[in-house]
Amino acid sequence: RQVVIDGLAKNKPKLGDAMDVLCKVGGYDHAGLAGVIIGGAMRRVPTMIDGVNATAAALLAYGLYPECAKYMLVSHLSSDISHKKMLEILNLKPIVDAGMRLGEGTGANLAVVVLQSAIDVYNKLSR
């Protein structure tokens, strides 16, 4: 916690200015993933957002190109309190809410199974 406080105090990112936040306290991973999210949205391709770091990148992408939120699918709600706060800002709901904090793409894998099952049910009921 103190490292984050010190980093923010030293670098003084302008809250609400996604590019400034990215430049001052973001990493290459955040920049790259934000670009993938924006690029997908510009092509109308959804992106699965999985976990706290990916959600931080999604928040940056949203700050740069708000339309991209329409193309974000959130795999799960992490037990990390910051995750819920970021999702509230993005106004997005997770596919799975099981208090997970496992990493390694576990949330995305589970969310894909849920989505596939929902599609199967829809297709069978629509016949």
Question: Model regions: which residues?
Answer:
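N-terminal loops that bind phosphate or other acidic moieties
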Residues: R1-R127
